[in-house]
Amino acid sequence: MSQSSRLCSGYYSLNRSFVEPFQCPQRGDGAALLYCCGFADLKYCCSEPGSYFPYKHSYMWSLSIGALVGLGIAALVLLAFVISVCVLCYLFLYTKPQRLDNGLKLQHLETSSTLEGNINRKAKGLNAVSNSTNETFYEADDGTQEKTMDITQINIAC
């Protein structure tokens, strides 16, 4: 065992007072406390080299239980937030009214002169279709009337 591990160098404590260097074990300490341990502002003799805390480890359990409770609450809040976002997204996406297809196609807007020309052409086309339909209808009516007249004449002759 080296002398350097048994010698604690001098240091300034938290209240800014200088603590003289000392040898481990100190008077009044057990024979097992052979090593110099601690921080730059608190040094003491301990039984294991590299030990940094002069306290028993039981106080750590109370700290870790508090930390676990805090982390658990934070996790629940985060989970509630994520679930809320998912529900709102679902409602936003799937509860919209369904769009009905009305059969109309989207058309690009044209200048007014081009639009008027198209309207005039369409009106002329509709009139031509209307006239040909009417003529066909009248032609059919004439044929029906001729047949009716022939049948009437035959009945009269008999």
Curated annotation (Swiss-Prot):
Subcellular location: Membrane
Membrane topology category: Single-pass membrane protein
UniProt keyword terms in alphabetical order: Membrane, Transmembrane, Transmembrane helix
This protein's name: Protein shisa-like-2B
Chain segments annotated as transmembrane: 65-85
Superkingdom to which the source organism belongs: Eukaryota
Gene Ontology terms: cellular component: membrane
Native species: Mus musculus (Mouse)
Lineage, broadest ranks: Eukaryota, Metazoa, Chordata, Craniata, Vertebrata
